[in-house]
Amino acid sequence: MSRPASSNPPGRSPLRRGALTPTLIVVAVAVVGFIFFANVWTDVLWYQQLGFFEVYIRENLARIITFLIGFAMMFAAVFFAIRIAYRSRPVYAPDAEARDNLNRYQAQLEPVRRVVMIGLPILFGLFAGSAAASQWQKALLFFNQEPFGQADPLFNMDISFYLMSLPFLGFITGFLISIAVVAGIAGILTHYLYGSIRLMERGIFTSRAAQIHIAVTGALFLILLGVNFWLDRYTTVQSNSGRWAGALYTDVNAVVPTKAILAVAAGLVAILFIIAAIIGRWRLPVIGTAMLVITAILAGGVYPWVIQQFQVRPSENTLEKEFIDRNIKMTRAAYGLDKIDVSAYNATTTATTGALAADAQTTANIRLLDPNLISSAFAQLEQYRPYYQFPQTLNVDRYMVDGKVQDTVIAVRELNPDGLSANQQTWVNRHIVYTHGYGVVAAKGNKFTADGKPEFLQSGIPSNGVLGNDTSYEPRIYFGENSPEYSIVGAPDGAPNREQDRPAGREGGGETQYTFSGNGGPNVGNWLNRILYSIKFQSSDLLLSDGVNAESQILYERNPRERVEKLAPYLTVDGNAYPAVVDGRVKWIVDGYTTSQYFPYSQPQQLQNATVDSQTSAGRTVALPNSSVNYIRNSVKATVDAYDGSVNLYAWDDQDPILKAWQKVFPTVIKPYSEMSGDLMSHVRYPEDLFKVQRELLGRYHVTDPDSFYQNNDAWSVPNDPTVSEAVKQPPFYMSLQMPDQEKPAFQLTSSFIPQTVNGSARNILYGFLAADSDAGNVKGVKGESYGKLRLLELPTDTQVPGPGQAQNKFNSDPTVSQALNLLRQGASDVLNGNLLTLPVGGGLLYVQPVYLKSTGETSYPTLQRVLVAFGDKIGFAPTLDEALDQLFGGDSGATAGDSDNNGQTPTSPPGTTPPPAGPTDAKADLKAALDEANKAIQDGQAALAKGDFAGYGAQQTKLSEALKKAIDAQARLDATPAPTATPGATPSATPSPSPSS
């Protein structure tokens, strides 16, 4: 017998073709699984290397456990709802038509029944598990909560109940209600599909089993709804639906009682459902449900509305007074404003001779270097190589210099791989050769050189200065704000150095090589780790390069802020990490906050809105995330070592209950602040973002009287930054300052207030001045007594003290200042306004603003040329702050500024005064000669830059500065003559170019 011819193509069997699809699926699953494993295992290696494996384990265990619980609860509820409905299906129908329909439905469903009965619960379980896993922090806080020792004014519950119990209980209740609803719908649909529920002409037929199932599900839903109503009573103190946060008159007298009534009513209706399940009659539960809905609408919605509209609104100021008082007190407590020192400050506007004598120390420390503008000067003078860079905004700190505290503008010289030339842009160069920056650069905040350059305290390569040298501190910067994504470092003993370390000299002195010797990252010396990291970073070069050896480490997650965020996911991290030389190392200091949005009666704040200012809007610092909080504490100070990336977390506010709860969750990762060295203590600052949030609240909450608060006639605003063109808030400023009640200056963070801005306009006069003490001392593990103290100076409401915007307008509109600035613009140069500082000295408020000159060349940088000062209606304008203050205060301010050593040139006449007469012909000749000198200096300077002659460029900048000073002096003499002539070639514009401030 002959076999039938096969229809398959020759050489291809059905088995091979049928096995291809499952093989591809298995391969795809294996690839995805291995990629997932690579990401998980590299995370394990990273946390282990840093000594924070406990964080990884506990966080992920919490996520996994909450996911599994959520998944299991939803899966079980939906699965058993479907299974019970299926098993209780009727075996026969009462009539032929119903039987035929039932058989047809069952025939269609039977092929997929098992898949649906398992797949549907799994699908809903995955959604539920994911939702539960996202609440892992609430779960951990609930099981590890710590008491506040303070009760809310309505229910007399400890604050911890609202911050750590209620959020979790609310989630659990809502989650269980969702499960009941989904399971109930799944059960009802199954009953319908299998005939237990049928739509008939006489009504709806429901089998006895379906009735019991629905009744039990309904009872469970109503019980959970009743619990939710009961918990809603407590959430009224967290409400933000009214004009003020918290439970107000209507909430206390209408909403809270109504919620209690609805909770009891829901429980009673649940009992009716249980009775219906037993006796099989549905009239009572249907009536009860209808009554519950009507009660919820009338008592829960209409009644509170009537109370609010017809009782509260006509007498709001009296009825809400008690609750406004609660809001004021609880808000101030939640934001750390309850212990602020408030002093009346009757500021004078009269600049009298010797007025600064009592503020001599403050005057000597007034900062002139603007950390926003001076970055390019650091780059031109200290960058040395194109593969180095400085941040756009530098940081302000303080160091001990010659036995005195010196305000300092500081930055680290970080690596910039994008600065490599095109033929250097190889994988080896970017990840193995060029791995780190080098050195700290710091300049005195209150001084500058004769030609307007920063006066450096620490500079050069090799690094040298008052902060140490290459042997006294580790200058290499492997971890920074602009470090490469990853670098491969390390080598066996005796292997040649491969890393580019630093230039051997300033000009063409070659390069030195180095090998990283610390413990900075996971080892990639074995093939498994190399493969896993190649997958993580999607780089075959990492796997195949001969630059990777048995001792190689991989450095990544190198940004200090992001590093701390990953190791402490329960913290909100400040937007500005700053470097400091501490105990022979460069350390990044990062502030961490514990926050909550559940503090009773506290006014919520959007963190992003509160922390936006002219620095964040320009991208110089990072604004906080767009999340709402109504409680914040600077609970943690973190340090990140710039060399090896090691991280230390210190419990700075060790009395914060939220931090205590997290310490119970992660008991070994947060150290007590008693372990902080004295050197580290001396560089701790009051954090900027916390200060911004607090000053935003103080605009209203400096008022503590409920009646005045209600009237809102004494609200303040943070002034806009007058040195930028956009309408954005002025940033706070770090400076050494002696407040009126202090015996000596302290490093402080400051801001000012003007009347409330209404519809975009406000009177720009000063109403308040806020300072936060940032002096933590220099003793190991001991905080300075005054650290964190907030001091607020309140000016009288009839004050005539100008605000920052008004002071800037005075500078811009003064004729003498305008003419001088026009002269500075000669020769294609820009005039840049530095930060406008406000200081409470001399019995009033002093404004100080440095004025920088920058030529328009690509390689130019700003040099400080003049200083503007204002006190009341008077202004001063001179080459140095010391001279400007003497002009302002009748020839003698009574104090010596930090730049007094730069004096020696003939001071220009103060604005508004008449210089001694001089012949116009001589003045015109002098002016022309000075302008010619300035133009020649600019041309010669640009030629020097083109040749790479930085020393020659610096010399020409000095000549330019001297020539412009001569020109200004000549112009002043011309203006004093009876018939002044036009300034040759003067630029008509008189307004200084706006620039960002710090």
Curated annotation (Swiss-Prot):
The keyword Membrane applies. Residues 490-518, 888-923, 971-998 are annotated as: Disordered. Its main location: membrane. Pfam families: UPF0182. It is a multi-pass membrane protein. Residues 908-919 have a biased composition (Pro residues). This is UPF0182 protein AAur_2732.
